[in-house]
Amino acid sequence: MFKIMKDFTEQEKIIVLDFGSQYNQLITRRIREFGVYSELHPHTITVEEMKALNPTGIIFSGGPNSVYDEDAFRADERIFDMGIPILGICYGMQLMTTHFGGKVERAKDREYGKADIHVENPSRLFAGLPTDQVVWMSHGDLVVEEPAGFEVTATSKSCPIAGIADEDRLLYGVQFHPEVRHSAYGNELLKNFALNICGCKGDWTMENFSEVEIAKIQEIVGDKKVLLALSGGVDSSVVGVLIHKAIGDQLTCIFVDHGLLRKGEADQVMATLQGEFNMNIIKVDAKKRFMDKLAGVSDPEQKRKIIGNEFIYVFDDEANKLDGVEFLAQGTLYTDIIESGTATAQTIKSHHNVGGLPEDMQFKLIEPLNTLFKDEVRALGTELGMPDAIVWRQPFPGPGLGIRVLGEITEEKLEIVRDSDYILREEIKNAGLEREIWQYFTALPNIRSVGVMGDGRTYDHTVVVRAVTSIDGMTADWARIPWDVLEKISVRIVNEVDHVNRVVYDITSKPPATVEWE
């Protein structure tokens, strides 16, 4: 491993152990909000591996199991003897309880939802917090007898032991979920743990992150060349600017314009990244190549496959024209690492077939963002001096407008989606809602309807407006856009976009629907 990686072991951090809770990522994100670096690791981590990480504190997450199940998730019990602060949340508290000789039993009724707790014995965990507060419960078991050396710190009507603490050994447990927004003072409780109990300074910022990453990239790459597939999206753009700041023209970006981008997107990407940041970008006009392959294709999965494969072929063709490239950069995020089942992020590894690239493309992979969440990537982009138009660009699927035109793709349909989407984004911005709505776009379903425009009957396309609010995209709710804003959007689309006589608003949440239509 490269010498520069010592920065990670010296950095104060809180490790979250994954016991299967749906809120695991939230715990990590909350800790990071206090300026403390945090990572999610599997519960199977050994004490030796944990010591190598050199954590300042550890959090045991919740989980769906009972501690008495035969296949219940366990932790290396030696972790309790490391002498550093540990916080057990829900299942984590029950695991801590049984380890130290307390008693856990099945609750008469599973408790799920808001509950009122009373803080009886204020430990350092509850310092400065109200005696009575609302929390979020989600458990089927409960602690009925605290272990020796522990005190009960909080109670509720249905849960007599809602919190425990052993101040001497810096061991704490809560039966509720402080990481969930429904817990009124959950953030303050986690902040007490991170800053007051663990003693973290809270100095992890995007400024020092970028400084460390630039130094890592310089040491790892040396005088070699790096190749980046630039999509124009937030992740690849931030990766490009970060690496360019580190190694300058040793970075070459390939930007494939497949003709499925949003209005003005290709020009904006080139003007910003090449014009303002002086990045070395090879723009490939592959619009005809993609449209020829997509002619007559209406099945969404087939469209995805064609677009994905053709992108690979175009990228491969251009990469083969370059000499001396040793590294491939990729905009992998921490979410991707977690969802792939490997919560151990490495800065560099051998590249064989990442993202479906040809197996004979033997690059080393460099992923500078693989410890960051999406909101942190945006913050990093701002820190790097990137304009809001790029940093706050709307999430955009890999196949682009190819899956926002339902059915067969034609140039006419693409223009309808481009123009209507541009109007939507303009009106959302005018209404000051662009930071409030997580994602918004237009789609063109493969239907036409009768209308009346002027004095004549029309039979034209229907445009769907889709806008959702979300935290991480795993679930989403339809955005409550004010009626007057929706009216402006509808009127403008019908009047300014050719071949459209109807606009509808999708008010379906995820689940049951997905955010995209295809």
Swiss-Prot record:
Q: Which residues form the active site?
A: C90 (nucleophile), H177, E179
Enumerate the spans annotated as GMPS ATP-PPase domain.
204-393
Which parts of the sequence bind ATP?
S231, G232, G233, V234, D235, S236, S237
Q: Which reaction does it catalyse?
A: XMP + L-glutamine + ATP + H2O = GMP + L-glutamate + AMP + diphosphate + 2 H(+)
Q: Which Pfam families match?
A: GATase, GMP_synt_C, NAD_synthase
Q: By which gene is this protein encoded? A: guaA
Q: What does this protein do?
A: Catalyzes the synthesis of GMP from XMP.
Q: Which residues form the Glutamine amidotransferase type-1 domain?
A: 13-203
| Coiled coil (residue ranges) | none
Please name the InterPro entries in this protein's record: Class_I_gatase-like, GATASE, GMP_synth_C, GMP_synth_GATase, GMP_synthase, GMPS_ATP_PPase_dom, NAD/GMP_synthase, Rossmann-like_a/b/a_fold
Q: What is this protein called?
A: GMP synthase [glutamine-hydrolyzing]
* Pathway note: Purine metabolism; GMP biosynthesis; GMP from XMP (L-Gln route): step 1/1
Q: Does the keyword Nucleotide-binding apply?
A: yes
